[in-house]
Amino acid sequence: MYVSSLKFPFLGIGVWKGVRLWRQRSLGTSACALKQDDFIKELDQNFVRLQKKLMDSLPSSDWSPFTPTGDLPPERADVVIVGGGVMGWSIAYWLKQKENRRGALKVVVVERDPTYSRASTVLSAGGIRQQFSRPENIQMSLFSAQFLRNINEHLGVVNEDRIDIQFNPSGYLFLASEEGATIMEENYNVQRECGAQVTLMLPDQLKKKFPWINTNGVALASYGLENEGWFDPWTLLNAFRRKALSMGVYQCHGEVTDFSTAKREMITADGDPVTFSRIGHVTVQMPNSLESQSVECSLVINAAGAWSSKVAELAGIGTGPSNSLEGIKLPVEPKKRYVYVVHCPNGPGLDCPLLIDNSGAYFRREGLGGNYIAGKSPAEEEEPDISNMEVDHDFFQEKVWPLLAHRVPAFESLKVKTSWAGYYDYNTYDQNGVVGMHPLVNNLFFATGFSGHGLQHSPAVGRAVAELIVDGGFKTLNLSSFSFRRFWSQEPLLERNIV
């Protein structure tokens, strides 16, 4: 069992206070000061050797917060975070924020793509909203909005430039048909109960507020009045990363390829065997190299986003009998989504919100030069190939543009300027995040599967995971319903408002 220096502070503090006090009293009263001095020096040396021996036995022994971090992982760590996207760096920041003294926790973030060329975070449209159907998602968004508004208080670094998150508080606008109006009203009631500033509008009110909208087929609209809009995803990722590094977090560029685990088999009350395991070492493969490094650790956090299911399999999750808890996989898959930047000089102006059409198409303003970001999630039978980052331009021409032009007639004359593809860490079970410890691998935690809203919830989820680890439970927002156990108990936590 790993013995933490946090639990035994007397090893580094109490012993030394006693020695110093005894030494001061001895030197002040004894007539044999020289002999006592020699004895004290020898005793000091023995204590130094003892302290070094104790510290060498801990995973944090070879690290100093003042030592510059490099790309190679250390031999030991307290916490290894798999995934250096915004979720991983948020968790790292909050862990260091909660440590009781600098250097108490040695945290390592492992990211296989240091350029972030395939990262979900920086390829996102950058939206934040409170218009969800689950109270937990609404509460996380409310916290994240306040966090972003005060980001320099949280993530500012001395002698570094202030953070400009480029937050555009223009709101989200959801449109519903007759079939979806009842659900929209139900969601609205939940949102208001949670404190979200949202209003409902009938078609004539909608047309008065936004004259450029064609209201045909719209029965009801839901509009966010505060704390909704969009921001720059890369700035948030880099701000979390910069702050965490300044607090002593170690970053490593490489890919986690294996876990070494200790296993123990037990028999349940029903007489069924069950295997519990604990990760002892993480194997990190260096980029463009055959070299790998084994990292001894106490905890592992799976924040690998779209690829987190593969990381879970390395720990044996989902590899047992299909009718057992050991056989339940982490139901998170990569889903490729296209984002198109279009230009339309006569399109909606400064009042343009992030509009979610009842057809599933969406768009928002990008700057003030007549540019917009647009897209749509494909139907299940049209899911694109995830093996590459190529963009399907026919999908825009056939599936997106007609819907945009129907809702905003000015978009009939738009032109595509550029486009890109990104990945959702899509939870196929209920489209909600997975947060907390695995029930059988008792030092593996999850923070993944948010199905497109992980970026906006990263400040809240990072804080929640840090609370679980440092405090032993959720202290601010109760996210226990997001646990892995719901897959075994067959209790889906459905989110209706997935874009």
Swiss-Prot record:
InterPro entries reported in the protein's UniProt record: FAD-dep_OxRdtase, FAD/NAD-bd_sf
Recorded topology in the membrane: Single-pass membrane protein
Protein name: FAD-dependent oxidoreductase domain-containing protein 1
Keywords: Electron transport, FAD, Flavoprotein, Membrane, Mitochondrion, Mitochondrion inner membrane, Oxidoreductase, Respiratory chain, Transmembrane, Transmembrane helix, Transport
Obligatory cofactor(s): FAD
EC number: 1.-.-.-
Pfam families: DAO
Cellular component terms (Gene Ontology): cytoplasm; mitochondrial inner membrane
Role played: Required for the assembly of the mitochondrial membrane respiratory chain NADH dehydrogenase (Complex I). Involved in mid-late stages of complex I assembly.
Protein localization: Mitochondrion inner membrane
One of the record's GO molecular function terms: oxidoreductase activity
Main localization of the protein described in the UniProt heading: mitochondrion
Stretches that traverse the bilayer: 75-95
Source species of the chain: Xenopus laevis (African clawed frog)
Gene transcribed to yield this protein: foxred1
GO biological processes: mitochondrial respiratory chain complex I assembly
Domain of life: Eukaryota
